[in-house]
Amino acid sequence: MKFFAVLTLCIIGAIAHPLTSDEANLVKSSWNQVKHNEVDILAAVFKAYPDIQAKFPQFAGKDLDSIKTSGQFATHATRIVSFLSELIALSGNEANLSAVYGLVKKLGVDHKNRGITQGQFNEFKTALISYLSSHVSWGDNVAAAWEHALENTYTVAFEVIPA
């Protein structure tokens, strides 16, 4: 029992301010508008930040227009978007905090092992927000909900990724 209490405190400490149900609903409803645009989302990230594309050995040094129509690109884009979809589906319910924490912690460890920096995570965030703001119903409330969601996510991921 003490283990679960400690785990809960660690999670709450890492995600000190979980999304409210209203924020989670805003994130979910906006995400539902684009979650099937996997290739477009990843292409937007790579176009805005070629240094991120360079971190993917299968895409490094290749012309974005030529790779974004490949099956390999679609498969990888789907992996990324599916991960985000899973996190978003779990958001807004405090009972899911430990699951979210575990997924994001693993994301941080995996990306640290690949040499991904906090700066590149922040570039991804900027590109994702830019894509979302031009492809979904967007207002200050949606922007604030996404900022809160990504801040929570990055707080956990950055526990293992050096500054």
From Swiss-Prot:
Signal peptide per UniProt: 1-16
GO terms under cellular component: extracellular region; hemoglobin complex
Transmembrane segments: none
Gene3D superfamilies, sorted: Globins
Residues bound to heme b: 76, 111
InterPro entries: Erythrocruorin (IPR002336), Globin (IPR000971), Globin-like_sf (IPR009050), Globin/Proto (IPR012292), Mb-like_M (IPR044399)
Pfam families tied to this protein: Globin (PF00042)
Other facts noted in the record for this chain: There are at least 12 different components in Midge globin.
PANTHER family linked: GLOBIN-LIKE PROTEIN
Protein name: Globin CTT-V
Gene name as annotated: CTT-V
